[in-house]
Design a protein with these regions (language model features):
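Short loop/turn segments that flank or connect secondary-structure elements
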Residues: 1-207
Length: 207
């Protein structure tokens, strides 16, 4: 593994000029493509489906992570099951609004994983362009806020023996951050980051 860490303004050899749509990076991921609130916001907006509709369509599933219940992309059945959003030609059908973990492939946050993609012809590209996330600095701040909130929730759950409250807390978190649309009721507009932070402040009061 290359242990050099990058900033989003750096150039890194991650772009596969000779990508032929093999789809290898979209198979066999089991339940590892974990989704955060921004991912659900993107998927819901892009596909025109609510959180519940995405689950009913078999696109999402829930998993337990140190006591916390969170969503992930539900791969098709089988050891090498494909992403449900992979098209028949081996291309991502939701590329413009794909989840954060998919965008990070080979860069993670932000270091380069050697041999993450076996295709030849890698060329350098600016990491911010590779990620393709608008307001990237704001997104990075949000990722940190969500990470530490989840860390605090898991720590809280680990120290509590109240299983009934743990269940209620998980249902509350799912409703506040995933089920409820990120829409301003007064005018129907959306400002994900401001709405997320309002909900984060609310959620922290119950810990």
């Amino acid at each position: 593994m290359d242990h050099k860490y990058f900033q989003h303004s750096d150039l890194a050899k991650v772009y596969c000029e000779k990508c032929n749509g093999c789809g290898d990076c979209c198979h066999g991921m089991t339940d590892t493509i974990h989704l955060d609130p921004w991912d659900i916001y993107q998927l819901s907006s892009g596909l025109g489906k609510s959180f519940e509709e995405l689950r009913a369509a078999g696109i999402l599933a829930l998993h337990e992570e140190e006591g916390m219940i969170l969503p992930h992309l539900r791969m098709q059945d089988g050891e090498n099951g494909a992403c449900p959003l992979l098209s028949s030609d081996g291309r991502c059908s939701i590329h413009p609004f794909r989840p954060g973990l998919c965008r990070l492939f080979r860069t993670f946050r932000y270091f380069i994983v050697d041999n993450g993609c076996d295709m030849p012809g890698k060329i350098k590209v600016r990491i911010s362009k590779w990620l393709g996330i608008p307001e990237l600095s704001e997104y990075e701040k949000y990722v940190s806020e969500w990470h530490y909130f989840c860390k605090d929730v898991k720590s809280f759950l680990a120290s509590s023996d109240d299983t009934a409250f743990a269940q209620q807390l998980n249902l509350f978190i799912l409703k506040v951050f995933f089920v409820t649309p990120y829409v301003i009721p007064e005018d129907g507009s959306s400002d994900f980051y401001s709405l997320f932070r309002m909900r984060l402040t609310q959620a922290r009061t119950v810990l």
